[in-house]
Amino acid sequence: MEEILATLKEQQTTRKIHHLPVIHHGQVFVRRASIGDVDQIYDIACSVGKTRKDSYQGFLIDDYKADPEYYKAKFKGAVFELNHFYVAERSDVLLGFLMAYTKKQWLAKNPGWIEEIHWHPEFDMKKTENFVLVDKTAIRADLTSRGIGSRLYRKLIRDVRAREVHNLFGETVVDPVPNFASLAFRKKQNYTLAGVHYERYNGKIVTDLVYHRFV
């Protein structure tokens, strides 16, 4: 893991985009997503959800340009359904988004999820009694590594604590294409490895690492 993170840091340094303005914390506002945000949310997803996956920049597993109507409809549904769907914006321009599900919402979509995980032998299963699962965190491809994801997480954590939920889960793809950027973010956010999940996606087996964080 340390070698992976060191390589990631080197890649990010060499690939830094110098011409972009620095985003100061005071300029970025995080709020709940609304139906009027869907087009920009879709654009952000397209910027990191492509056919070709970039391990060091980070990616979403889906190819969003393949079916715009389908994915926009999914985002619209999520705006109405989810308690924790947030966007980060500056001057009415969305910079990133975060989608998270309560346990009830997640298991309604993935009823066998808990049983499908190969849990770490020392993981305390009581932590699955009540949780929120972060399904997607996406930042515009040209604005990564600028603290936007951390701001989205701070809003999420405040809200889940207010609901007296203290367990967060998230999954990171490691095969067939490893998401090194996501692995680095898990470490930054103090997640610990909880298990491994194998799932079939587009006819292939995808391997995800399942991470847990107490908040």
Say what each PLM segment does.
Residues G49-A73:
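Conserved GNAT-fold acetyl-CoA-binding loop/helix
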Residues F131-V134, T144, V160-P178:
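Conserved GNAT acetyl-CoA-binding A-motif
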